[in-house]
């Protein structure tokens, strides 16, 4: 019985991806452990933030690595309403975060992926909107 429960938990975990934030991506890249994140997801915003910070001659190569390793989640019309609602609420409270981080958080909320970030405190204010923060 215990073995079945463990197997079920493992399968459930494997089915649910994690949205990796730029801060975690940079950390793993610097440690040359990027492949350990393979199979997870990144926002197109994360890809842009990361690639703009590396030398131009490496950008195409890194983008191809990202395409191989990750599900790249694009921004589409599904994000418009949730982004706008959360933005208004945060603005009203004087708790705005920059648009790029809000896009990343809304992507995680819409896809129901926990967000793995090193900036947990920064994203905490979005938990009430359904953001789950992954804690390794």
From Swiss-Prot:
Record-listed E.C. numbers: 3.1.-.-
Enzyme class: hydrolase
A Pfam family recorded for this sequence: PIN
InterPro entries per the UniProt record, alphabetical: PIN-like_dom_sf (IPR029060), PIN_dom (IPR002716), PINc/VapC_TA_RNase (IPR051749), VapC_family (IPR022907)
Keyword terms: Hydrolase, Magnesium, Metal-binding, Nuclease, Toxin-antitoxin system
Domain PINc: 18-129
Residues noted as binding Mg(2+) in the record, renumbered to the chain: 21, 101
Cofactor: Mg(2+)
Domain of life: Archaea
Gene Ontology molecular function, alphabetical: magnesium ion binding; RNA nuclease activity
Family the UniProt entry places it in: Belongs to the PINc/VapC protein family.
Matching HAMAP family: VapC_Nob1 (MF_00265)
Matches recorded under PANTHER family: RIBONUCLEASE VAPC1, RIBONUCLEASE VAPC3
Function in brief: Toxic component of a type II toxin-antitoxin (TA) system. An RNase. Its cognate antitoxin is VapB1.
Protein name: Ribonuclease VapC1
């Amino acid at each position: 019985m215990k073995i079945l429960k463990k197997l079920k938990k493992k399968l459930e975990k494997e089915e649910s991806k994690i949205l990796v934030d730029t801060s975690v991506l940079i950390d793993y890249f610097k440690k040359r452990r990027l492949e350990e994140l393979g199979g997870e997801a990144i926002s197109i915003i994360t890809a842009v933030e990361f690639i703009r910070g590396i030398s131009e001659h490496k950008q195409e190569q890194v983008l191809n690595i990202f395409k191989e390793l990750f599900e790249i989640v694009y921004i589409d019309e599904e994000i418009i309403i949730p982004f706008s609602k959360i933005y208004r609420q945060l603005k009203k409270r004087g708790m705005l975060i920059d648009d790029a981080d809000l896009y990343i958080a809304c992507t995680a909320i819409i896809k129901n992926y926990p967000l793995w970030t090193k900036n947990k405190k920064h994203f905490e204010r979005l938990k009430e909107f359904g953001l789950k923060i992954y804690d390794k």
